[in-house]
Amino acid sequence: MFYAIKNNYDQAVMIHGDDQYHVKYVPKLFKSLENKKFSAVTGSRMKIKKNALIGKMPIYKFIGNIFLTFMFNLVFKTDFTDCHTGLWAYRVKKLKEINFGQIDNGYNFDSQLRINFINKKLKIKEIPIQTFYRDEHSSYHIKYSINFLKELFTYR
């Protein structure tokens, strides 16, 4: 993303490195950016809820995603279906409007960037995608969830 900004690309994509997101969706993301009213496009695992379950999203993550996205929508008066996706495409011109010095370069980067987009009235579109989950044994989801809820009120 920062390489795209530095080199004045038109569009950039961000894909989490956890092998959950297939690159086959990237052309659809970029195609959606052709509509100039959108500054970013995300792949939503929850737009068609069964897609998340077909991709073997653990039930606790499924329920957690619904709850945390509900809270986000409540606070910011938005109607997203998946605030925790790891698949984004951006219009680089709009990324240049963001002060990245105020955004944490960790697990909460995506949600802080989403909040920045909303606060700047930049439009985000969601397209439905499927993902694939592998067996995982991480306790970070609890810490992430707590930090996410804190951010809703900190960056509002």
Regions found by a protein language model. Give the residues of each.
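C-terminal, non-catalytic tails of nucleotide-sugar-dependent glycosyltransferases
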Residues: E151-R156
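Acidic metal-phosphate-binding loop of nucleotide-sugar-dependent transferases
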Residues: D19-Q20
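Catalytic donor-sugar/metal-binding loop of nucleotide-sugar-dependent glycosyltransferases
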Residues: T78-D79, G101-N105, R114-Q130
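DNA-recognition element of transcription regulators
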Residues: S111
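Acceptor/aglycone-binding surface of glycosyltransferases and processive sugar-polymer synthases
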Residues: M1-K6, Q11, V23-I103, R134-I142, ...
